[in-house]
Amino acid sequence: MSSGRIVQIIGAVLDVEFNRNEVPKIFDALLVDGTETTLEVQQQLGDGIVRTIAMGSTEGLKRNLPVTNTGGPISVPVGIGTLGRIMDVLGRPIDEEGPVQADERWSIHREAPSYAEQSNSTELLETGIKVIDLLCPFAKGGKVGLFGGAGVGKTVNMMELINNIALKHEGLSVFAGVGERTREGNDFYHEMQEAGVVNTEDFSKSKVAMVYGQMNEPPGNRLRVALSGLTMAEYFRDTKDPATGKGRDVLLFVDNIYRYTLAGTEVSALLGRMPSAVGYQPTLAEEMGMLQERITSTQSGSITSVQAVYVPADDLTDPSPATTFAHLDATVVLSRDIASQGIYPAVDPLDSTSRQLDPLVIGEEHYNVARGVQEVLQRYKELKDIIAILGMDELSEEDKLVVYRARKIQRFLSQPFHVAEVFTGAPGKYVPLRDTIASFKAIIAGEYDSLPEQAFYMAGGIDEVVAKAEKMKSSAA
């Protein structure tokens, strides 16, 4: 292993000088002697000098400190030993539960599976959330993006998906917290403990591994923590489960993929690269592709990923969310307008899309009901201007009926969440897909035209709506 010395420190960027014959390779991990600081080589400047990004604080470092080349990229522990643990970008435990008991370590920089190794799946993944299951269904082994501005419910939606999928799904999950609030990471850990997904008595019985690089971390950590989490998920996908002899089906949750882009922007600026549109790094598409192409399903197992995507200033054409769109199978767009009406989850039923919304995949009935719901909502959207100017009285009887049904559909797309019970006091509801399809089919057919629209708000199944309407009727009488 070659050794060098620090010659320059500018924030998180350090230049290290090595003997010209022993210059480290790009992405090699370097260790600063006498500290716990790890550096990752980003550029070779010539004359034996490499430019690196620190994976941690550079406080206390100074010029001429000796640095050792590890001879390989950053590696993280993988396998059953990671379950139930919270780790940082380097795989070090941060939950104060002792060292991670792992037999293997894998490099975080890996090749994406080849075209021949990949496999496609059309199997649906039921989430129990009506609006998602009906209008933007998820595929097992697919990639899903939750798009939304600040405060419209990305993290709450993701927590509910974890609650509904990960708790019912018998497989394993990996949660990568990329540049989000430490409080949210802490809440998530305690919720997982209460749900029994993290078993602190016997970690091997846990179902989730957690990797955190939070908001207060240096940009190097936030840039690489998604790769650390992905590497752990890849291990579960690619290695055989002793029970089945096949790779596993893994769930990968990333909150928030925008912070990954943002960390790349910071690192790019620190390295002196010329910025591109809106100040983003010129390598934005490449960096996003390197991450997303690895999140895929192979012949041995699958990775189903759910990624929260912050949308700056609610602008979906911003380069960061726009680049992310291209990689996803389903996009769930959260709308501030819908949130302002008090309808949660605030999913935009006309903006959200899924590759699975195809009659050959989901069946004719589901497809026709989903399109019928969207047609009613689209017509209501077109009529809103007329209603605002002339009022409801100027509409034809047919259009009035569309408006009444659309308002009921809008309210019925809301749903109480399990993870929000502590705030709302309303018990969470899981609605099976077949019930969702039957309920909306009946609403657009006019079977519930007689019920008041308030009865549809924050209900689970249609039976609950009927019961609410009866209660309202009896209390009014």
UniProtKB/Swiss-Prot annotation:
A cellular component term (GO) from this record? plasma membrane
Keywords from the named record:
ATP synthesis, ATP-binding, Cell inner membrane, Cell membrane, CF(1), Hydrogen ion transport, Ion transport, Membrane, Nucleotide-binding, Translocase, Transport
Supply the name of the protein.
ATP synthase subunit beta
Please tell me where ATP binds in this chain. 148-155
Q: What is its EC number?
A: 7.1.2.2
**GO molecular-function annotation terms?**
ATP binding; ATP hydrolysis activity; proton-transporting ATP synthase activity, rotational mechanism
Q: State one Pfam family annotation.
A: ATP-synt_ab
Q: How does it sit in the membrane?
A: Peripheral membrane protein
What is the organism lineage in this UniProt record? Bacteria, Pseudomonadati, Pseudomonadota, Gammaproteobacteria, Moraxellales
Q: Where is this gene product found?
A: Cell inner membrane
**SUPFAM superfamilies, per database record:** C-terminal domain of alpha and beta subunits of F1 ATP synthase, N-terminal domain of alpha and beta subunits of F1 ATP synthase, P-loop containing nucleoside triphosphate hydrolases
What Gene3D superfamilies does the record tag this protein with?
2.40.10.170, Bovine Mitochondrial F1-atpase, Atp Synthase Beta Chain, Chain D, domain 3, P-loop containing nucleotide triphosphate hydrolases
The Swiss-Prot or TrEMBL record describes its family as follows:
Belongs to the ATPase alpha/beta chains family.
User: What CDD domains does the record tag this protein with?
Assistant: ATP-synt_F1_beta_C (cd18110), ATP-synt_F1_beta_N (cd18115), F1-ATPase_beta_CD (cd01133)
Question: What's the chief localization of this chain?
Answer: membrane
- Protein source organism: Psychrobacter cryohalolentis (strain ATCC BAA-1226 / DSM 17306 / VKM B-2378 / K5)
Determine the domain of life of the protein's source: Bacteria
Please tell me whether the keyword Cell membrane is annotated for this protein. yes
Q: Which reaction does it catalyse?
A: ATP + H2O + 4 H(+)(in) = ADP + phosphate + 5 H(+)(out)
> What is the role of the protein in this entry?
Produces ATP from ADP in the presence of a proton gradient across the membrane. The catalytic sites are hosted primarily by the beta subunits.
Subunit structure and binding partners: F-type ATPases have 2 components, CF(1) - the catalytic core - and CF(0) - the membrane proton channel. CF(1) has five subunits: alpha(3), beta(3), gamma(1), delta(1), epsilon(1). CF(0) has three main subunits: a(1), b(2) and c(9-12). The alpha and beta chains form an alternating ring which encloses part of the gamma chain. CF(1) is attached to CF(0) by a central stalk formed by the gamma and epsilon chains, while a peripheral stalk is formed by the delta and b chains.
